[in-house]
Every structure is written in C-alpha cells, then in structure tokens.
UniProtKB/Swiss-Prot annotation:
Needed cofactors: Mg(2+)
Keywords from the UniProt entry: ATP-binding, Kinase, Magnesium, Metal-binding, Nucleotide-binding, Phosphoprotein, Transferase
Purpose: Catalyzes the reversible transfer of the terminal phosphate of ATP to form a long-chain polyphosphate (polyP).
Record GO cellular component, one term: polyphosphate kinase complex
Phosphoprotein found in the keyword field: yes
Residue positions binding Mg(2+): R377, R407
PTMs per UniProt: An intermediate of this reaction is the autophosphorylated ppk in which a phosphate is covalently linked to a histidine residue through a N-P bond.
InterPro entries: PP_kinase, PP_kinase_C_1, PP_kinase_middle, PP_kinase_middle_dom_sf, PPK_C_dom2, PPK_N_dom, PPK_N_dom_sf
Protein name listed in UniProt: Polyphosphate kinase 1
Residues at which ATP binds: N46, Y470, R566, H594
Organism whose genome encodes this protein: Chlorobaculum tepidum (strain ATCC 49652 / DSM 12025 / NBRC 103806 / TLS)
C-alpha cells in the first residue's frame, strides 16, 4: 500500500478539479452565456488562492531544503515543476475560451469589450475628459531610481510598468502605477455621459487601457516609451505562533496585516514586456524565472464576476426559488416542529430560511434561556449574528465560538467577535493549534416538562448567501443522546478541550479517523462473511493516507465503494487487485457541492453520518470537526437516495480512471443532471404542506 503509483498528487488533483470548473465555461451547452463567464471568474479566483496558499507553502519547503517526497513520490521541487506545466496549459485554455468563444458570443448579444484605440476620436475625447475627473486624482506615479526605492506592490495588485525617456537628457527611466482596486475594473461606457445609453448594446473597457492612454498626464515632462501590465501574487498564509500569543485576536489582526508583505510567488506579465523590464521586476521582487507567467490579454480575471450584474435574464440561469415547508404550516413555532420529529433540509433546494428563523426565534422566545453556536464563515451582513446579539441584549446566555483563523475571513470574523462581546455575549476566539470548523447550534428552552435542548447540526456554514449557492444538509433534532454530547463538546470548547467520551458524535481530532476506519473494517468483515458490503461517501476532498488504504483493503475484500468527491482525490480507483471495486465521481454544476455524507450498509442496518469533516489530515488532526449520526431510518434512506441520484448523474459528473485522469461520465442510461433533478422535485413540492413533507422531499 506504500507504492507511490497507487496515489495521485494532492496539488495536481486540485488543479484537475479547477480544470473541471473551467470546463463549465468551455462547454457551450452547459450554461447560459453570462454563467459561463462566472466560471471563468471562479476558475481564476481559485487559481489565485491556490498560489497564495498551496504554492507558497511548497516554495517555503524548497527554500528550507526539504526534499521529503509526498505519498505519490514527488519532491517539493518536482511538484512545482508539474504545477507550472499544468497551470500554463490551463491558462491557455482559459484565454482561448474567453477570447475565442465567450467574448464573440457576448458581442453577438450586444455586450462588447472595446479597445480605446478602436473608438471614434469624439468618444476618446469624452473618455479622456472623464479620466481626468474620475481616475486621475486616485493615481499615484512611483519612480524608481537612486532617490526612489523600488515601490512596494501589494498582493493581487494590477500594475503598469512604464518606460520613460527624459526629453532633455535622453535617460531611460522606470516608473510604476498601480491600477486602483477601489475603482471598477470594467468601465461600463453606457454609464458615462456622452457615450450613449442604449441598453441593448453594452460596451465595456478595461480600466487599465484608459490609464495607459493617459500616462502622459502623470509624467508631463517625460516621453512615454512603453507601458506594460503586470500582476503580483504573494504568499497569503498567516503563520501564528499560538502558544506564544498573549491575545489571539490581536495576533491574528497583525497576521492579516502582514499578509500584504508575503513573498511573491507569481508574477503575471504581458508577453510584450521587454527583457530588461522583466529582469528588473524579477530582481527587485526577489523571485526566479519559474515564478513568471506570460499571459496574453487581461491579467486577473476574477473581476469578470462584475458581468453578473448585467440585467439580461435570457443569458443567466433561470431563478430558482427554494422549497420552504414552513411557509404555510410553521405558524412561528419551529420548536414544536422539531419536537414532532427530526427535520432534514438539503440546501439550496430547501430554503436556508428555517436555519435563520431557528436562531431568530430562539433569540426572541422568552422561554429560551441560552444559545450556543460555532461560527466559521458567516458573511458581512449576517442575520444570524444579529439574532445572537439580540439574544445577548435581552439577557439570554449566549456563547459563541467565532473562529478567527478562518482563512480570508479573519477580518470579518474579528468584527463580529467584537460586536458580540460589546453586547455581552461570551465569545471564544478558537482553540490553540486547532481550527473549529464544526457547524453546531444548541438552544436550551424552558418547557412545562422541564428544560429541553434543541440542536441544529450542519454540513455547511451559517451563511444565508452561500446557503443559496452551496449544497449542504441541515439537521434539526431534540434527541437527548445527541444533545448531551453536543453539550459536552460546547463545554470542551468554552472550557478546556479534554473531553473524549463521545459515543455517538465523531469529533476531530479525537475519534473521527478511528471511527471511520472502524466502520470500513466492519464492512470488510461483513463482505468476507456474505460477499456483500457497501460504502458511499460524499466529501469535498479525499487525501488521508490511512483512510485511503482502508478503502483499498475494503475493495480487495469485495466491498462495493462509491465516492462522490468534488475536489481533491488522492485515491486511484479501478486498479486490478487494489481498487477495482471503487468508483469515484465528481459533480461540477450550477451549485457548489459542499455536503459531507458517509453511508455504511452495515449488513442491512445502515449507518449514516453527516457533518463538517472531509477526509484530509487537516480535518482529522488539526481541526475541531463533527460528524453526527442520523438515527431516523426514513431520513437515512432519503440521504442514500440523494447519493444514488448523484451517482446516476451522466451530464454533470466526471469519473476518475486508474491512471488518475478525469473524463466525463457518458453512458446510454436516461440523461440525469442531479442538481436539476433536485430543483425539479422541489418545484413540484411547493404546493405540498404539512410537516410530513420532511420525510419525502426527495
């Protein structure tokens, strides 16, 4: 099981995932036109983050002289070489798709990207006048010579490298102008007076083009020889010595500020940039040639997300209104609904509103005594945090673990943590050495029979915005066995993290890997007795070597294993004698597949766990994660049916072969787009009323 050929490199597997995202833009029949643009933007943003975190980490290993090989047999240097080759190929595919297909198709729909040089002189004059008024005051020209140090360039900044000639002295100079991130990257010409406002014909101009045309205003005594675009990506991973941190909040604030100064890991340049300017940047940014990427066209494509604001419904996905079974029947009493039986929702097909309503109702209910909750990514305008603040202000006991180390959400979470503290909530910033990624809410309510505990347990964040875009399960219960263990977990989080006696919950870093492998081994034993055994797992990533090896053992024993893995998968299915009984698919579609579900047939007494944990070392060892059991057999069957539907997808699913390559699933079975099927079923259910609907939504 230690043979490197049995495994796929983690970093390359992630790049293969992002290639599947890009394919949603490339394939013309998959999405409306503007939605295809969205996938170009998502692909580009994903790749930026990959360099900021993953590539930066491997670069540090190389700098430290580390040559330890990954489980698939690659050294850090070898990984960087393969990453570079794959990224160059993917960027070419992206630009071919954008410039050769999508932009011409948009132009045919009256949405055009224009070049300044192609505009009539009258319109150029209007734009130049607008530049002087709206852009020029924001710009800062920065010289580089013996009297001016090389200018600092922030992470993800788009810049212009300018060659200047002193007219009087004939000396060649260099300067830099940053394209302001506070201004829209795409200038909508229809909104500029004097350039027309025909809504049927929208024109966009990259802001950097307009700046380049007006550089003479910034350097009035010099001749502009040439200007070239370039873009910087820096190491954005925050290193925190938590054992030495006296105040975690202040330490993370300092770390967020330091993110601007991380080492440069990628320099994007235009191919026309002359060698001496290229070398000047390489030398002063202290990078190597392998960090430089030549990119035709505009640099930094995540800004294309701005096009989603265009009001052209025919070029976008048809709006979907999620099903909310409480709309007519809840009567404001979600607690009675939970008391009548466990509730399971599948977002975004089921509305996220009941989750918000649960917290809001708990905050306003005079019989609710306390609310405890974990928060990881909640968004910038969170109704859930506002409800918690309302609860604290009304005198309820409110305890909230706000994970300050949630990457790229640190500043937002710091703001919410302070706001909660200001109204009297008990706020925990996280645990030393661990990120708390679990999704838990515990509400204690006074009722005629005594105090009663209500739970919301989820696979996704407490964020209504992502609740419309990510597929996740929400589970409501008043089960005392689960409530007791969740109470113990909250006490461990707010006190000292030492409790280990969980019988029902799987809690990382305590028992998740151990219990998952035990359940795999149980299927192996059952398969050997009866030639049966079935495992279905759905997750974002499968990386953990010990779990992969357990799955290989299960396959060799005859257990039938189906894995739905959205992103990274280091397991190779279909290898004779090793993994021929394992199938791996990945679904990429309108919604981001985000739920985690682990189903074990258990000889006819199936067990199902849902929760926050992927099968990665970081989730099993370095985070507080939870997987919770679903006891209701009807709900277990419902989730199994969800998984089987996804496994039958032959329109949006990809499969991985024994060689580690991904191909689209294509067969002669009836066509199935699982996400569309879930939406269609909810649309058909919208006239259904009554709590019984919770058992038959799928």
């Amino acid at each position: 099981m230690s043979d490197p050929s049995l495994y796929i490199n983690r970093e390359l597997s992630w790049l293969h995932f992002n290639r599947r995202v890009l394919d949603e833009a490339i394939r013309q029949d998959q999405h409306p036109l503007i939605e295809r643009v969205k996938f170009i933007a998502i692909f580009s943003s994903n790749l930026d983050e990959f360099f900021m975190i993953r590539v930066a980490g491997i670069e540090k290993q190389v700098e430290a002289g580390i040559r330890k090989k990954t489980i698939d047999g690659l050294t850090p240097s070898e990984q960087l070489e393969r990453i570079r080759a794959e990224v160059i190929e993917q960027l070419k595919l992206r630009n071919t798709c954008l410039y050769g297909d999508i932009l011409p198709a948009l132009a045919a729909e009256g949405i055009t990207f224009v070049h300044f040089a192609d505009l009539p002189e009258k319109e150029q004059a209007v734009l130049n006048a607008w530049f002087r008024k709206e852009i020029y005051p924001v710009l800062t020209p920065l010289a580089f010579d013996t009297g001016h140090p090389f200018p600092f360039m922030s992470n993800l900044s788009l810049n212009l490298a300018i060659e200047l000639d002193e007219v009087e002295h004939g000396n060649l100079k260099f300067a830099r102008v940053k394209v302001p991130s506070v201004l829209p990257r795409l200038l909508k010409l229809n909104d500029i007076e004097g350039l027309g406002n025909d809504p049927s014909c929208m024109r966009f101009l990259w802001i950097e083009e307009l700046i380049q045309q007006n550089l003479g205003l910034l350097f009035p005594t010099m001749k502009i020889v040439q200007s070239h675009q370039f873009r910087i990506i820096r190491n954005a991973d925050i290193e925190i010595e938590e054992d030495e941190a006296g105040d975690l909040l202040q330490t993370i604030e300092k770390g967020v500020r330091s993110r601007r100064y991380g080492n440069v890991v990628r320099l994007d340049i235009s191919p026309e940039m002359p060698d001496f300017v290229r070398q000047l940047l390489i030398n002063n940014l202290e990078i190597e040639e392998k960090n430089v990427y030549e990119i035709d066209g505009a640099l930094g494509m995540s800004c294309l997300m701005e096009l989603l604001d265009i009001d052209r419904p025919s070029l976008k996905d048809e709006p979907f209104i999620p099903f909310n079974m409480f709309e007519e029947q809840r009567n404001g009493d979600i607690f009675s609904a939970i008391s009548s039986g466990d509730l399971l929702f599948y977002h975004p097909y089921d509305s996220f509103k009941p989750v918000v309503d649960f917290i809001d109702r708990a905050a306003s209910d005079p019989d609710v005594l306390s609310i405890k909750q974990t928060l990881y990514r909640v968004g910038s305008n969170s109704p859930i945090v506002k409800a918690l603040m309302k609860a604290a202000e009304s005198g309820k006991q409110v305890a909230v673990l706000v994970e300050l180390k949630a990457r790229f959400d640190e500043e937002n979470n710091i703001g919410w943590a302070r706001a909660l503290e200001d109204v009297g909530a008990h706020v925990i910033y996280g645990l030393p050495g661990l990120k708390t990624h679990a999704k838990l809410t515990l509400v204690v309510r006074r009722e005629p029979q005594g105090l009663k505990r209500y739970l919301h347990l989820g696979t996704g964040n407490y964020n209504p915005s992502t609740g419309k875009l990510y597929t996740d399960y929400s589970f409501f219960t008043d089960d005392e066995l689960l409530a007791g263990e969740v109470s113990e977990l909250f006490n461990a989080l707010t006190g000292y993290f030492r409790y280990t006696g969980y019988r029902f919950l799987l809690v990382s870093p305590i028992n998740t890997r151990k219990r998952i492998i035990e359940m795999i081994e149980r299927e192996i034993a059952l398969a050997r007795k009866s030639s049966g055994g079935r495992i279905i797992m759905k997750m974002n990533s499968l990386v953990d070597p010990a779990t992969i090896q357990a799955l290989y053992r299960a396959s060799r024993a005859g257990v039938q294993i189906d894995l739905v893995v959205r992103g990274i998968c280091c397991l190779k299915p279909g290898i004779p004698g090793v993994s021929e009984n394992i199938r791996v698919i990945s679904i990429i579609g309108r919604y981001l597949e985000h739920s985690r579900a682990y189903y074990f047939a258990n000889g006819g007494s199936p067990e199902l766990y849902l929760g926050s944990a992927d099968i990665m070392p970081r989730n099993l060892d370095d985070r507080v994660e939870t997987l919770f059991p679903v006891f209701d057999p009807s709900l277990v069957e419902r989730v199994r049916n969800d998984l089987e539907l996804q496994l039958s997808d032959n329109l949006k699913a990809w499969k991985i072969g024994p060689d580690g390559n991904w191909t689209l699933v294509r067969n002669d079975a009836p066509k199935v787009n699982s996400q569309e099927r879930f939406m269609k079923r909810r649309t058909q259910k919208k006239k259904t009323t009554g709590i019984k609907g919770r058992l038959g939504l799928n």
